[in-house]
Amino acid sequence: MTDVADTLPEPLPDLPAGRFSGRETFQQLVRDAFATAARDGWHEIVISDAHFHDWPLGERVVVESLQAWARSGRRFIMLACSYDDVIRRHARFVRWRGTWDHIITCRRSPAANPLDMPSALWSPQWVMHRLDPERCVGVTGSEPDRRVLLRESLNEWVRGKSTPGFPSTTLGL
């Protein structure tokens, strides 16, 4: 006989605040953030990175969280220098992106220096900002000042330093 408590998923921890270091820690923060977004019903998510090559976007658990999160009225903004690594490494995410095109805005800035592009996940509730993407060192938190400053930086990139990119379908002749 199995105990019902043994079959229930682990409750999500509150998202942390403070410094983080290491690729595995970073990737787990991304997984936890998307799971929390689905659980808590975040209305908007913005992700930004030069290439997203080390983000766990193609993992089943991430796409399942995004699927649970996605619905009408939600907004997902994605900013990158190039989406080549996303297409090559994250097939599940690319399929999810095609399904939910109506709530997703993708922007690209191919001429930008990849080191200048913010590597971040922003929501109205919590943010994660990799200050050194190579070493996976960054900060997280829900403080209003941190959220506002990061959003202003991301808005500058979205509005003034990028163009539409990563279409959900490619039409051929």
Language-model features and meaning:
Residues M1-V46, A50-L173:
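PLD/PLD-like phosphodiesterase catalytic module centered on the HKD motif
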